[in-house]
Curated annotation (Swiss-Prot):
The keyword ATP-binding does not apply. CDD domains: TIM. It comes from Mycoplasmoides pirum (Mycoplasma pirum). It catalyses: D-glyceraldehyde 3-phosphate = dihydroxyacetone phosphate. It is an enzyme of class 5 (isomerase). This is Triosephosphate isomerase.
Length: 150
């Protein structure tokens, strides 16, 4: 059977206080429970270390994105090497919002996937079309292309 992993993407939500409250409630609700699946969250980058410190040990803390270049003049991005340094193993790549708002192409997604794999990290690949592609019944074709190019 394939391993299933459930990751909640927090996008640009939650303050430090809200992160602490989330994990307080989560940890209390998981007490003495047998968890039958692998699960995690992808908080905004500034909360990664806080989330790691508060999360139950079996929980995955993932990054929402990573630059495929390890360092340099890339204001506002976080590099795979910075994530690896704080022991973040999972990284979301190819999210529709990154494709739409930051013009990330299939080629950029491919570079990110390859770079993460080369550095023994795990990409969480997002594929999917937009509403126009859905209405034109091109979702399958778009997903197949994105998957192939990644």
């Amino acid at each position: 059977m394939k391993k299933r992993i459930i990751i909640g993407n927090w996008k640009t939500n939650k303050t430090q206080k809200e992160v602490k409250e989330f994990f307080k409630i989560l940890n209390a609700s998981l007490k003495n429970k047998n968890i039958c699946c692998t699960f995690g969250v992808a908080p905004v980058a500034i909360h990664l270390e806080l989330a790691k410190s508060l999360a139950p040990k079996q929980m995955i803390i993932a990054a929402q994105d990573a630059n495929y270049i390890s360092s340099g003049a890339f204001t506002g991005t976080i590099s795979w090497s910075q994530l690896k340094d704080i022991k973040i193993k999972y990284v979301i790549v190819g999210h529709s919002e990154r494709r739409m708002y930051y013009n990330e192409t299939d080629d950029i997604v491919n570079k990110k996937v390859k770079n993460l794999l080369e550095n023994k990290m795990i990409p969480i690949l997002c594929i999917g079309g937009n509403i126009e592609e859905f209405n034109n019944k091109k979702t399958y074709q778009v997903c197949a292309t994105q998957l192939k190019k990644a």
